Structures are given as C-alpha cells and as structure tokens.
Swiss-Prot record:
Pfam families: Phe_tRNA-synt_N (PF02912), tRNA-synt_2d (PF01409). It comes from Novosphingobium aromaticivorans (strain ATCC 700278 / DSM 12444 / CCUG 56034 / CIP 105152 / NBRC 16084 / F199). Its EC number is 6.1.1.20. The keyword Ligase applies. This is Phenylalanine--tRNA ligase alpha subunit. Disulfide bonds: none annotated. One of its GO terms (biological process) is phenylalanyl-tRNA aminoacylation. The lineage of its organism: Bacteria, Pseudomonadati, Pseudomonadota, Alphaproteobacteria, Sphingomonadales. GO terms for cellular component: cytoplasm. The keyword Protein biosynthesis applies.
Length: 366
C-alpha cells in the first residue's frame, strides 16, 4: 500500500496548493470521481480475500476520509477569502452624509384631534361619530331650530336636492351636534361623549373655510349643573395648552340648543406682540378671546333625544379644532390648512412618533 500512501500525500499536497474553487473541484474529480483513484481502490475491495479486505479496507476508507475533509476545508477557505475580498471592495463609507428622503408628516388638525381625544378619554369621555350627510331633523329640528330659524338659510347651509325616505331635506351637517341626538337616542343616559369631525358651512375668508373641523362634548346625568361645565372646560384647556394659569370668563349668550348658554373666553398675554394663552385677560398686557360655546342642554333637546328632562340634565360645549390648532401652534391663516403646501406641512406638521400622551405631553414633538 505504498502506492496508496504516495497518492494520498500527492493529493493532499495538491489540495493545499489549489488556488481556486475550480482547481479544488478538479482534484475532487480525479480522486473521488467515478474514474478517480480512491473510487478505483474502493471497487478493488470486492476482489480481495476477507483477510485482505480486513487489512486494506480501513486504509482505503481512511484515505477517502482524509481527502474528503481536505477538499471541504480548502473549498471553505477559498470561499471565505473570496467573500472577504468582495466585502473589502464594496466597503461603504458610513461617514458620508445620507441623502434626504421625502417623508410625510401628521397634519396639525389630525394631531390636535388626537390630543383632544387623549385629554377627554382621561376624563371619562367616549368618542362618538355620525354621518356627514345629515337630514334636517337631526341637524336642526331636534336641536331646537325650527324651520323658520335663520341657520337653515341657503347662504349658511349646503343642501342636497334629494330627500330621505321620510321626506326630510338632506344637507352637509353644519355642526357635529347631530351626533349628540343620535347618541342619546341610541345609548340613553347617563352619557359622556365627544364628537369630533368635519362640518360644512358656506363661508370662506382668512378665519373661515367651507369645510372645517369641530369637536363637541355632551354630558347627560342626574344633578348636572353649570359648575360641572366650568370645571370640565378649565380642566380640558389647562391640559390642552399645557398651562396651569388658564383663566376662563363665561359670558351669557344664546344658542337654541342650550339654556342658559355661555360663551367661554380665555385670558391671554401679549408676548412680543403675539397672543400667548394664559394668565388673566384683565392684566395690563392681557386680553380675552373667545374659544368655546357652551351651556346647559335645552329641555326640548333632551326630549328630542328620547329622555325625560325632569330626570336628566346635561351640558354641552363646542369649538373649532382648526381654531384651537391655530391658537396653540401659532398659525395665522386657516386656509393654509387645506392648501396641501408641502413646505407648510413640513414646518407645522408632526412626526409619526409624536403621539400625544398626558404623561409625555399632549403637544410633544420627537
């Protein structure tokens, strides 16, 4: 078996010197292929006597194992070296500045909607929604606005030529108050909801658009009075503007769906010529501005909601989401909200991770 030892030594030497995977494969074929010398020796075992097989068999199998192992190790080494060379040639310079990628932003109105929902959820309010195409009963009649009420005029309301199955006129809702009626009819009392959403009125200037966003709140329970309303609004505005020095002023007003009705002013301070919400409006450098309409729910509205006004009382409030966004984040023209200007959105928009939380701050930016 001197020839076996010599062939094995020559093969192992050739494997060690192989410089390419192709050379390794050629050696494998010459040794382990069908016509290879190792294969020939394995075939010769069949013609040997039992004593010869017992003597030579282990040597032949050992040679095959040695060659197989050497081939695998050399192939792996060559592949590793090739990979390292390729990686070295493709090295990325991480110090180079990355190109700016276009990214979207959360619209201020959407962000403020989330802020309001977070605040009122902490106060026990549920979010309710309703159709934007309403009938005049839910939009006007059930809210104590009869057919002769001026709010029904064509110049204030977008009407459709269609009527519903009951012959009621269809329109784009002028406020989210119909959601209050639908919620009372569906859920009954006690009730504590906010109703954010889009509303429509025929008006357009720097502070008004034909479509805008509104949020209204409704609380129905036993023993509700105006003090509950004031506490709710103070708590809400302090959380929203993230200031403890919020001062409210309630002025008598008129809304057909509340009695008594009050308009809510918030005190502000002039800082570098700009209004900053907070502090008393009676201060030398301060003033008052209206932010909310509210009042105790009219008895007729409670009746239209299917409840007994002698048993249940409530308060309601409403404000423009767009106006709140303008006050909090310093935007001047409401029409810019809907222009789709990417530069404006890039400046005033919020990141996807700017999720409002009471613990982290409802107006936080990442």
């Amino acid at each position: 078996m001197e020839q076996l030892d010599q062939q094995q030594a020559e093969t192992l030497s050739a494997i060690a010197q192989a410089a390419t995977p192709e050379a390794v494969e050629a050696i494998r074929v010459s040794a382990l292929g069908k016509q290879g010398w190792v294969s020939a020796l394995l075939k010769s075992l069949g013609g040997m006597t039992p004593e010869q097989r017992q003597s030579e068999g282990p040597k032949i199998h050992a040679a095959r194992e040695a060659v197989t192992t050497a081939l695998a190790e050399r192939k792996s080494a060559l592949e590793g070296a090739a990979l390292e060379a390729r990686l070295a040639a493709e090295t990325v310079d991480l110090s180079l500045p990355a190109p700016d990628l276009a990214k979207g932003s959360v619209h201020p109105v959407s962000q403020v909607m989330d802020e309001l929902a977070e605040i009122f959820a902490d106060m026990g309010f549920a979010v309710a929604s309703g159709p934007e195409i309403e009938d005049d009963w839910h939009n006007f009649t059930a809210l104590n606005m009869p057919e002769t009420h001026p709010a029904r005029a064509m110049h204030d309301t977008f009407y459709f030529p269609d009527k519903d199955a009951e012959g009621r006129s269809m329109l784009l809702r002028t406020h989210t108050s119909p959601v209050q009626i639908r919620s009372m009819l569906k859920a009954g009392a006690p009730l504590r909801i906010i109703a954010p959403g889009r509303v429509y009125r025929s008006d357009s200037d720097a502070t008004h658009t034909p479509m805008f966003h509104q949020i209204e709140g409704l609380v129905i329970d036993k023993g509700i009075h105006l003090g509950h309303l004031k506490w709710t609004l103070e708590t809400f505005l302090k959380a929203f503007f993230e200031r403890d020095d919020i001062v409210l002023r309630l002025r008598p007003s008129y809304f057909p769906f509340t009695e008594p009705s009050v308009e809510v002013d918030v005190g502000y301070t002039l800082v570098n010529g700009k209004r900053v919400v907070g502090g008393s409006g009676d201060a030398d450098n301060g003033g008052w501005m209206e932010v909310l309409g509210s009042g105790m729910v009219n008895r007729k509205v409670i009746e239209f909601g299917g409840l007994d006004p002698d048993e249940w009382q409530g308060f309601a409030f409403g404000t423009g989401v767009d106006r709140l966004a303008m006050l909090k984040y310093g935007m001047d023209d409401l029409r810019a909200f809907f222009d789709g200007d990417a530069r404006w959105l890039g400046h005033y928009g919020f990141g996807a991770l700017d999720v409002p939380t009471l613990s982290g701050g409802v107006g936080v930016r990442s």
